[in-house]
Amino acid sequence: AEYLGYIDKTELDENLKNLDVALDGLRQGMFAPKNRGRLIEKTEEGIDISTTLLTKGYVADDEIERFPGVPRRPGVHPVMECTQNIPCNPCQDACPKKCIKIGEKITSLPAVDESATCVGCGMCVASCSGQAIFLVDETYEEGFASVTMPYEFLPLPKTGDRGIALGRNGQKVCAAEVISVKSSPAFDKTNLLTIKVPSE
């Protein structure tokens, strides 16, 4: 672009420097080449790594509460079960209300910005390539909570369908009722399934 006259040498050098920094950020985190073969016991934030995730493929209930993306509060809010320092930030960029913070370092664990108000649009849920984000409303209805999750199976369930909700480990947890199924081009072929479950 410089030799064609679109940008000058100073701007080119600045752009190349920014690209080098961004590329270096993508080579960081617990799965970075420099960490190959190393036993990582804590996240960059000092939180114990989920050993269940690494050995069984899911985060155990007693482990998930220690991560910053799992708040408890009234009203609809995101719950991010992202427990590893990996270079990823689509959820932060997708949220129109800036409810999700990752910060300057792309490998930081996502956290909910308590000063922002979630509108329940679901963009964060649809944008997460790891399918690790849910929208939860613990005060959906007297005695019931709602959970919105990514859904990529066919056929799509219908509002009013009933079934059994499963936990992270695949075990039966409780009865569930489908209260909505949303599909949109903005969700990039990921549907958002919202179920109603007992609050307990």
Features from the language model and the residues they span:
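Short, charged beta-turn/beta-strand-edge "cap" motif at the junction between a beta-strand
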Residues: A132, G167-K172
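Short, solvent-exposed secondary-structure boundary/capping segments
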Residues: S183-V197
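Iron-sulfur cluster-binding cysteine motifs and their immediate structural context
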Residues: A1-E2, N89-T107, M123-T139
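Short, structured beta-strand/loop micro-motifs enriched in basic residues and often containing a Trp
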Residues: Y140-M149
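Short, well-ordered loop/turn sites that connect or cap secondary structure elements
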Residues: L156-K158
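N-terminal intrinsically disordered, low-complexity, charge/repeat-rich segments that act as generic
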Residues: N35-A116
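Short beta-strand-centered aromatic/proline hotspots
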Residues: Q171-P185
